[in-house]
């Protein structure tokens, strides 16, 4: 028993160290200006250390893999306490419909084009599509946990989604300020929340909008986050069909149901602000360590021939979000 505990603790300690470095980097003005969260920085630090970790014989691999799976799911569940059903009423049926169409359309289109047009493998296509459609890296991690995707594919998808999310975050304020898009402030908020990848991207891009528009942006984004639950439930049956013969077990994403349960609990019962803050910190800490673990076990030898195609898929979906999302907002909002 002692022999198994030591590598387990070493692995967790290594991921914790990566997480601490990521939190430290996130406070540096340069990274603050880019709105890069510790979650994103953690996977970058992990990927930078991946060659060394491979040469070291992957010390503490048991603990690292535990962080990449169990701690990941815990972080996703705790993330649900940041969303309340009451807040969703602020954008009405139109906001919900726009979010639903974006999630369904982008995920379906990305999964299809990645395989049929670009020749990407199915897993990478779905990860990029999910991250673009729902909530960036958090959605990719949720799908990775369900589909048991290799770490290097997850790292590729996260990198692509982060890139185009950052581009949008810097582009949108410039476009709004220049008046290139004929939208009302409220429509700008809905458009921002419906089309940007990460929650942090939405907050950054809407910072200069009126308060009402900022709230609309966050609410629409949170609707997309909630839609992750039914998406994962549907995918659990789709993924089953592509598994090897002899496996009849349905991959029910229990963590997705717990995520929904967290949303309901946070909506129906009073949570003091200190407790909500604690749960939010717990979610961020868990996901940051999980991202570090995924970066650490990334196999760069498997990245060849995939990067350009993955970027192409991300670019296509980015364009559809920009122009298709604008059309939806003009038509429905």
UniProtKB/Swiss-Prot annotation:
Keyword Cell membrane tagged: yes
Subcellular location, record wording: Cell membrane
Pfam family, one: Cons_hypoth698
Membrane topology, record value: Multi-pass membrane protein
Main subcellular localisation: membrane
TM helices/strands, residue ranges: 4-26, 31-53, 59-81, 88-110, 125-147, 154-176, 218-240, 253-275, 310-332
Gene Ontology cellular component terms for the protein in this record: plasma membrane
The entry's keywords: Cell membrane, Membrane, Transmembrane, Transmembrane helix
UniProt record similarity statement: Belongs to the UPF0324 family.
PANTHER family: INNER MEMBRANE PROTEIN YEIH-RELATED, UPF0324 INNER MEMBRANE PROTEIN YEIH
Protein name as annotated: UPF0324 membrane protein WS2204
């Amino acid at each position: 028993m002692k022999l198994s505990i030591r590598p387990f603790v070493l692995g967790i300690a290594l991921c914790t160290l990566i997480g601490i470095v990521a939190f430290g980097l996130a406070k540096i003005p340069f990274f603050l200006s880019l709105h890069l969260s510790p979650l994103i920085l953690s996977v970058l630090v992990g990927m930078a250390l991946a060659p060394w970790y491979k040469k070291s014989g992957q010390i503490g691999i048991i603990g690292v893999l535990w962080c990449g799976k169990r701690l990941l799911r815990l972080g996703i569940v705790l993330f649900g306490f940041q969303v309340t059903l009451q807040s969703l009423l602020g954008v009405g049926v139109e906001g919900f419909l726009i979010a639903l169409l974006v999630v369904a359309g982008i995920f379906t289109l990305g999964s299809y084009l990645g395989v049929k047009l670009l020749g990407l493998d199915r897993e990478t296509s779905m990860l990029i599509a999910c991250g673009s459609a729902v909530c960036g890296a958090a959605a990719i991690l949720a799908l990775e946990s369900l589909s048991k995707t290799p770490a290097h594919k997850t790292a590729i998808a996260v990198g692509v989604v982060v890139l185009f999310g950052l581009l949008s975050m810097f582009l949108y304020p410039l476009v709004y300020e220049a008046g290139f898009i004929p939208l009302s402030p409220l429509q700008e908020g809905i458009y921002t929340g419906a089309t940007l990848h990460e929650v942090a991207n939405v907050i950054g891009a809407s910072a200069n909008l009126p308060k009402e528009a900022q709230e609309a942006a966050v609410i629409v984004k949170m609707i997309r986050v909630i839609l992750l639950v039914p998406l994962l439930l549907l995918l659990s049956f789709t993924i089953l069909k592509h598994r090897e013969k002899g496996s009849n077990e349905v991959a029910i994403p229990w963590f997705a149901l717990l995520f929904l349960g967290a949303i309901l609990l946070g909506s129906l019962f009073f949570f003091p602000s200190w407790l909500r803050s604690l749960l939010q910190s717990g979610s961020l800490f868990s996901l940051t360590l999980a991202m570090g673990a995924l970066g650490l076990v990334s196999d760069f030898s498997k990245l060849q021939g995939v990067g350009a195609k993955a970027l192409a898929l991300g670019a296509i979906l980015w364009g559809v979000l920009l122009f298709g999302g604008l059309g939806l907002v003009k038509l429905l909002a």
